[in-house]
Amino acid sequence: MTKKIIMGVTDLSFHRTTASLVANVLKAMGFEVERIFSPHQENFEKLKTGQVDMLSSAWLPSSHGIYKAGVEEVEPLIELGLHYEPYALWGVPDYVPEAAVSEVFDLLKAEVVKKMNSTIQGINPGAGITRFSIQVMKDYGLSDAGYQFFPGSEDDCFSAFESAVANKEWVVVPLWKPQFLHYRYDIRELKEPKGLLGIVDRAVLLLRDDKKHLFSEQQIQKLDSLRFSNDIIADLDYKVCREGKPQDQVTHDWLIENGLI
């Protein structure tokens, strides 16, 4: 009888790509895999209530540590693998002169305020980058300088950036790595001396301890051995999001090429 695994996937493109890699590995082990896509906090809530057996991927400790702790109030979790090493950032297109804008403080310069798009378009409210960005806006006094930060959808964020770049506008984009925009565009990270954007996290698979029995020790070791990278995820995600290739096929082909299934 085929064993079934329900995987909670944070509903952003690179999380879907990473989850597709893991799902293909699970299928190769003989599992039937159902993926449920949810926003950040809802995904962790489903892990907590047992609606999903595992979650891909948790950014620990800074971005999602608070959500993981909430789950572990009711059920221990097992961390598996190192999918990539993500971090949050604020960036500008490389055509914005570094002499003018190299760090967040530079956004307060009068000459920069005149040229920079005042809208900073983010993603959904539960994302680490959104929480961090709201704090950056506050601590640097950017609202007082005329900037506005808006949470929104992933597409809102990417479209705003790509539209600005098409018009060679100066624009700030709250992003992270891995992200497929880095594959196509040269985005310069701004220094953020107050340390409000978190640290370099570990992106891992989380498995509820009460579901560990579904796996053999060898299968657990296989899941724990999975190592991708920011560049690998960004590359695969670009193929899906901008080249229109089928996600599960893209990740399946990559796993075969790299001898992982």
Give the ranges of each region predicted by the language model.
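Ligand-binding cleft/hinge of the Venus flytrap
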Residues: 21-29, 113-147, 253-260
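A bilobed periplasmic-binding-protein/Venus flytrap-type ligand-binding module shared by bacterial periplasmic
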Residues: 88-98, 201-215
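An extracytoplasmic/periplasmic, membrane-proximal ligand-sensing/linker region
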Residues: 136-150, 155-166, 174, 179, ...
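Alpha-to-beta junction loops
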Residues: 48-57, 117, 163-173
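Short helix-initiation/N-cap motifs at beta->coil->alpha
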Residues: 12-13, 31-46, 148-160
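Short, well-ordered beta-strand elements
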Residues: 1-14, 26, 31-36, 117-121, ...
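Ligand-binding "clamshell"
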Residues: 66-79, 168, 180-194
